């Protein structure tokens, strides 16, 4: 659903189908706790690894797991990334677009390509299991959604770092970072918040080879860990 382009009429019809699906779940007495389980959350982490998905997934899935009473650690994301390679060379980690991904078959194809790497008996919002949902799914473009034996990158889209600056862990997206920047040493330019960082960038205070660090923008300080896309665009 999320991959359907905004201009496609399919998005409107999918909205109606979603309403019908919700009513059918109510009729069958299938509840969120029947769908959101540890196994289904691990499936979501594996899909995010395969698509090179957003670092936001870490924040959201940890919150969902907490509300569902599922024990989940940030370091499990890093473990999954070592097991599930990056299958979709999509911008910014490749040349393909979200439209290409949708036309290749989208998330359902990712689940199909992951094969026995996912829990296939999990209940879903269709009222069927993952395995039942995938029976007729076909990969329409293996260049966009790669098979497991021919990934875009050998590691997943998310990496969890740990060190003296982040003893409880930090999240990065190596699939979107140029290879030459994976091993880097340089001075840090520290800002206490996003507003200060934007002012500093616009005032040309950042020199080539410096690392920009924006503090106090996590789940509590932000609040909500907002994306630093303005600073990145500048």
Predicted regions and their residues:
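Catalytic or ion-coupling anion/metal-binding cores of large enzyme and transporter domains
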Residues: 1-234
């Amino acid at each position: 659903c999320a991959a359907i382009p905004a201009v496609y009429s399919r998005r409107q019809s999918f909205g109606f189908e979603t309403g019908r699906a919700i009513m059918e779940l109510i009729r069958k007495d299938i509840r969120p706790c029947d769908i959101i389980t540890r196994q289904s959350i691990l499936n979501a982490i594996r899909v995010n690894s395969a698509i090179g998905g957003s670092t936001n997934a870490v924040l959201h899935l940890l919150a969902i797991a907490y509300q569902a009473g599922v024990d989940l650690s940030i370091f499990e994301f890093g473990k999954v990334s070592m097991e599930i390679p990056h299958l979709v060379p999509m911008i910014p980690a490749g040349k393909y677009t979200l439209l290409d991904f949708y036309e290749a078959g989208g998330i359902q194809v990712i689940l199909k390509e992951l094969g026995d790497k996912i829990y296939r008996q999990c209940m879903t919002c269709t009222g069927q299991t993952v395995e039942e949902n995938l029976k007729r799914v076909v990969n329409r473009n293996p260049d966009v959604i790669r098979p497991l034996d021919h990934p875009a990158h050998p590691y997943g889209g998310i990496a969890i770092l740990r060190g003296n600056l982040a003893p409880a862990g930090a999240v990065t997206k190596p699939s979107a970072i140029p290879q030459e920047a994976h091993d880097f040493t340089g001075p840090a330019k520290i800002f206490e918040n996003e507003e200060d960082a934007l002012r500093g960038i616009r005032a040309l205070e950042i020199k080539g080879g410096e690392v920009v660090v924006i503090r106090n923008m996590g789940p509590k300080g932000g609040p909500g860990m907002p994306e630093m896309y303005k600073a990145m665009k500048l």
